[in-house]
């Protein structure tokens, strides 16, 4: 990943992880150990989905810019589908508190989106690629 992409990833992941830690503490106080486990699972899941999504979108923007918007929509649909699969797999689980899981997932996702939006607004992204500084020598010979 180029350094700008890593910078945006870190500026989104660190606040989301901090919000996830706070959610885990609050869930532990409110719902006990299972609440804390639910908040940690939700934090890891949200950060994993959002991080992979950011990585895929950054690669798409560089290699296939004409597919960027379609890839964003497809990625959003895939994230929602994967979340539904996860929820269906752990529908009747007793491993964690589902309410603290749901609230933590929502809060961490919103924190990631807000932090990523802020990071993109502060980033100096070039909209037009600059011309290379070195002049290419002209071909003077016969081309065959």
Swiss-Prot record:
UniProt keyword Membrane, yes or no: yes
Top-level division of the source organism's lineage: Bacteria
Bilayer topology: Multi-pass membrane protein
Keyword rRNA processing: no
Main location: membrane
GO biological process terms, semicolon-separated: proton transmembrane transport
Signal peptide: none
Cellular component per GO, a single term: proton-transporting ATP synthase complex
Localization (cell): Cell membrane
Name of the protein described by the UniProt record: ATP synthase protein I
Source organism (scientific name): Streptomyces coelicolor (strain ATCC BAA-471 / A3(2) / M145)
């Amino acid at each position: 990943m180029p350094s700008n992409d890593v910078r945006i990833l870190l500026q989104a992941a660190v606040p989301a992880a901090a919000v996830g830690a706070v959610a885990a503490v609050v869930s532990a106080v409110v719902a006990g150990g299972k609440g804390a486990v639910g908040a940690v699972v939700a934090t890891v899941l949200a950060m994993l989905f959002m991080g992979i999504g950011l990585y895929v979108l950054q690669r798409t923007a560089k290699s296939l810019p004409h597919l960027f918007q379609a890839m964003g929509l497809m990625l959003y649909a895939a994230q929602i589908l994967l979340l539904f699969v996860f929820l269906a797999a752990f529908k009747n689980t007793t491993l964690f508190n589902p309410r603290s899981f749901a609230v933590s997932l929502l809060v961490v996702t919103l924190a990631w989106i807000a932090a990523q939006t802020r990071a993109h607004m502060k980033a100096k992204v070039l909209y037009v690629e600059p011309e290379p500084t070195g002049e290419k020598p002209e071909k003077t010979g016969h081309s065959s």
